[in-house]
Amino acid sequence: MRKLGVFNNVSLDGYFVDAYGDMRWAYRDKPDAEWNAFVAGNASGGGELLFGRITYELMASYWPTPLAKQNMPAVAEAMNRMPKIVFSRTLGKVTWNNTKLLKGDLATEVRKLKNEPGPDIVILGSGSIVSQLAQEGLIDEFQIVVNPIILGKGRTMFDGLKERVTLKLVKSRVFGNGNVVQDYEPAARDA
């Protein structure tokens, strides 16, 4: 069975996107070699990417561009090479290479995907998908990057969660740019 993981950024005050729905705050202007190497290593690890429509549109508008290849060549290469799945009821088609569009019930489709042979699956962005799949107990790993920024308001990654999901910290790593990567796995479900 394939594992389903999440790799996402949050602010110190727990927001996934700012008050305008923007995530660019997580990508600081100053390059950080240690952080870039970590991100490139994650991207080169392979797998299949899973997005919701909004994240797909953001990613598809950036990673295939010359600017992405200039700024983060290893990550751009991996993002363009890796197979991708986008869940959307409103998109008519997808144009980014190696992308499959699914319109069915999210939890049902993800259960099917996890039971198919293939690489592990990683959700990037896609807060509503993360929330729904966490509620269903379908996420095996959460890799959360706490960024050294306070947004004051925005939306959390788990908006809409109806019941608690208890996690166990597996690993934590601090980077020179102030990011703290925390790896969690589900511990038990609370009623």
Q: Which role fits each region the language model picked out?
A:
Residues 145:
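Extracellular, beta-strand-rich glycan-interacting domains
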